[in-house]
Amino acid sequence: EAVDAGAQFIVSPGLNPAVVEWCLSNGIPVTPGCITPTEIEKALSYGLKILKFFPADVYGGVKGCKALFGPYKSEGVSFIPTGGVDLGNLKDYVGQPFIHAVGGGFLCRTDDLAAHNFEAITTTAKKAVEILLGFEFDHMGINADSPEKSEETAGLFEKAFGFVPKFGNSSNFAGPSLEITKFPGLGQNGHIAVKTNSMPRAIHYLSRRGVEVDMETAKYKGDKMIAVYLKEEYAGFAVHLLEK
């Protein structure tokens, strides 16, 4: 009935073999609820790796998901927790490698829907996106033209303000928020780094807002992207994302 009404995927609170088998036979993506190793192994036998975790607050929340993820990490299992998730604890789930997505009725409260209070729903959704992305200033970069100049500049900040220098291969830091490159980098005036909880989500979000990233500048740690610059400079500063 749900598919006939236009549903393109099915999410269920538990793992009902009849429902799962019907969905697989009819090419409908399905995400069953699984809260025990037995249920997870049953889902894996169907080739399903993205699983609902419901009700999340009753079965341990982040700790519960993490505990179940441990023995099935190599299988690529991830969870969609729902039930008891709200703006207050949403941040706890963000960035965890075993969390595929998060759901909750807090995004669209029944009374707001009944009253057609779409402004309140929009405000809540925007706040949720802000929490998911977690954009924060991380550091500012100063372009030096040599390793010696970079070290000298870091020393000046230490002498004046007590910013303890940290020396690296391609740059030096004066305290946690000032990076002095050893050679001229991107940006006429230097660069600004903005942290985010999720690089893929941040790039998608920015692209939807017409902000382009320069994928040629992307840096990886293994298969995971950890930094990438925007194509546009802001007031002479190159801007790059940095995953927390």
Regions found by a protein language model. Give the residues of each.
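Vicinal oxygen chelate
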Residues: 122, 178-182, 207-244
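C-terminal helical cap(s) of enzyme catalytic domains, especially alpha/beta-barrels
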Residues: 23-27, 111-133
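Catalytic beta/alpha-barrel core
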Residues: 7-16, 29-40, 49-59, 81, ...
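Glycine-rich phosphate-binding active-site loops on the catalytic face of alpha/beta enzymes
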Residues: 13-19, 52-61, 98-121
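N-terminal beta-strand motif that seeds the catalytic metal site of vicinal oxygen chelate
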Residues: 129-154, 187-194
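Generic hydrophobic/aromatic pocket-lining and core-packing "Φ" positions
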Residues: 20, 40, 65, 90-91, ...
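Catalytic cores of alpha/beta
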Residues: 1-5, 38-47, 69-70, 85-101
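Core segments of cupin and vicinal oxygen chelate
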Residues: 141-181, 201-208, 219-226
